[in-house]
Structure formats: structure tokens, C-alpha cells
Design a protein with these regions (language model features):
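Generic alpha-helical secondary structure signal
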Residues: 19, 111-115, 170, 219, ...
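Short, charged/small-residue-rich alpha-helical element at the C-terminal edge
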Residues: 227-300, 307
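Alpha-helix N-cap/helix-start and coil->helix boundary motif
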Residues: 12, 96, 120, 194, ...
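Generic structural signal for individual residues within well-ordered alpha-helical segments
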Residues: 77, 99-100, 115-118, 170, ...
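ABC transporter nucleotide-binding domain
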Residues: 174-263
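Alpha-helix boundary recognition
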Residues: 65, 78, 198, 222, ...
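Short, Lys/Arg-enriched, disordered terminal segments
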Residues: 1-4, 302-307
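ABC transporter nucleotide-binding domains
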Residues: 3-8, 13-189, 194-208, 212-214
Length: 307
């Protein structure tokens, strides 16, 4: 039996001869939160739709619970809850009344399932507030309550914090983590917001232009970040000449803002400062630093697009 609850093998999607997702190999472990991170248009939603069999892949395979999704979708899909696009709730009904309609359509025992799912996301069963009066955060909560109402083993959530204010984001993040730690759900969540994925995910896949660039646990990704000496000098070009001529330093980079990152950690900082001052170069800042996850993501995706 595979250790992965969801696995994709060479998953590919083409539209009019152009690939939106290319040869994707995801590995999602049971009882963990997997964050699919990428800029808008990177292929996150398309990937989730293929996993859920909502759209056909052009090539490749989706394996869920050790079985082919294409061959066994009728058996697999009832064990999955999802939020890909906002459900069509009735604006003039309460949250509970809306869920009752969906429960009846799906043949779910109403009261207990609805009450438990609402409580799980912090909404009240007897609340008389209409859906049209809900805040964005409450609407997202209700959508996730609908996704978990049938007690699925897997949750697939596409950008669940999109459009929320900071309080709403924190609330949604808290109960998603609760679903994993207390209920044992396996959760696949997508986002273009790095800081949120960093706060919630156990494992991260980085997708860009439909290609999976990296897949690691959050802990491993943090360990991959480089330590360096940050140098901000009045004249970066002259400072670089000192590094090369006086200290034989070759392993460095110069940022667009003039900041110099020195990756040779054997360099003695006081000696460097003394030499720079002797050359008439004012030192504004020098200290040991470590690349953040944002630095790493920008480096492998080639720049902007991830908040």
C-alpha cells in the first residue's frame, strides 16, 4: 500500500496544443496538509480539477487511495470534499437552511451532520442570519462546512482564503488546521500567498507555468535556505572589488538594490570592515542573515507573482 493518499503520475493538460499543466508528479501523505503554491495562472486550479475528475487530463494518471481515479471515481469521490469554486447558496436562506437542501440532495442525515459541520467552522446551527447578510469570511466558512458535511477523508480547497480580510484569513486557517490535527483529514490547499501556506502546510509543492519546481516538507524547505553575510556599502561596485582582490571571494551575489550577499561564511567580518574603511568605502550594514522562504521561492520561480 502506498504511503500517499493522493498521487499524480505525469499529469498533463493541454488546451489548443498549449500545456497548462506539464508532467506533474504530486505526492500527498495521509493526515497532512499539502500546500500547492504558485502565482495566479500557474496551473493550481487545473490540477485540482483533474485530481477530482472534473476535467479530463491529456496524459498521466491520478491515484487516490491506491486506485485509479478514472476507473474508480464513483467509489473514490464520496470520500472527498472540495471547494473549487463558490457553491451556489440561496441568498434569502440561512446557512443551516442552505445546508439542509444540499444534505437532502446528497442523502446525508440532516441534523447531526449539519450541526457538526457548522460548529467545526465556527458557525451556529440556529443562527437566523441570511446568507446575503454574511461577511466574506462567513461565506467561506459555510462553503467549507458544505465540503465537510459528509465527513470526507480528503479535503481539496482551492484558494480558500482569497478575498478575506486578515481576521477572516486567521479564522479559516485555524479551523483548517483543526480539521487536520483533530479530525485526521488529509488536506490539499492551493494559494498564491506564501505567508499563509507557510503558516498552515506540512508539505509544499511549488508550481509555475504548469511545472512542479519543488516538492518538500516545510521543514526541509526551511533547511535548504542559504546563510550568508549581508553587506550594504556606500559603493557596491568598489566593495565587490575589495572582496575579490583582498579576500579572494567569488561566491557572492549583488541584488538590484545594491545589497551584497556573501556566501563564504569563513570570511572574518571585522577584517572585511577594516579593509572597506581603509579603501574609503562606508559600510551601512553588515551582518549574518539567512534566506527566507520568500527568497527561495523567488529564486526558483524567477521573481514576482507570489505574495
Amino acid at each position: 500500500m502506498s504511503e500517499y493518499v493522493i498521487e499524480t503520475k505525469g499529469l498533463t493538460k493541454e488546451y489548443n496544443g498549449k500545456r497548462s499543466v506539464s508532467d506533474l508528479n504530486l505526492h500527498i501523505k495521509k493526515g497532512r496538509i499539502y500546500g500547492l503554491l504558485g502565482r495566479n495562472g500557474a496551473g493550481k486550479t487545473t490540477t485540482m480539477k483533474m485530481i477530482l475528475n472534473l476535467i479530463n487530463s491529456s496524459d498521466g494518471e491520478v491515484i487516490v487511495f491506491g486506485k485509479s481515479m478514472k476507473k474508480h471515481n464513483k467509489e473514490i469521490l464520496p470520500r472527498i470534499g472540495c471547494l473549487i469554486e463558490s457553491p451556489g447558496f440561496y441568498p434569502n436562506l440561512t446557512g443551516t437552511e442552505n445546508l439542509k437542501i444540499f444534505a437532502e440532495l446528497r442523502g446525508i442525515p440532516k441534523r447531526n451532520a449539519i450541526k457538526e459541520s457548522l460548529e467545526l467552522v465556527g458557525l451556529k446551527y440556529n443562527d437566523k442570519k441570511l446568507f446575503s447578510q454574511y461577511s466574506m469570511g462567513m461565506k467561506q466558512r459555510l462553503a467549507i462546512a458544505l465540503a465537510v458535511m459528509h465527513d470526507p477523508e480528503i479535503l481539496i480547497l482551492d484558494e480558500p482564503i482569497n478575498g478575506l480580510d486578515p481576521i477572516g484569513i486567521a479564522e479559516v486557517r485555524t479551523f483548517i488546521r483543526k480539521l487536520c490535527t483533530e479530525k485526521g483529514k488529509t488536506i490539499l490547499i492551493s494559494s498564491h500567498i506564501l505567508s499563509e501556506i507557510e503558516l498552515i502546510a506540512d508539505d509544499i509543492g511549488i508550481i509555475d507555468n504548469g511545472v512542479l519546481l519543488e516538492e518538500e516538507s516545510l521543514e526541509e524547505l526551511k533547511n535548504m535556505n542559504k546563510k550568508y553575510i549581508k553587506l550594504v556599502a556606500h559603493n557596491d561596485s568598489k566593495a565587490v572589488k575589495v572582496l575579490e582582490a583582498c579576500f579572494n571571494i567569488k561566491n557572492y551575489s549583488v541584488e538590484k538594490n545594491g545589497t551584497i550577499k556573501i556566501y563564504d561564511l569563513d570570511l572574518v567580518i571585522p577584517e572585511l570592515v577594516r579593509e572597506l574603511v581603509n579603501e574609503g568605502i562606508a559600510v551601512e550594514e553588515i551582518r549574518m542573515k539567512e534566506d527566507t522562504l520568500e527568497d527561495y521561492f523567488k529564486r526558483i520561480t524567477g521573481g514576482a507573482g507570489i505574495a
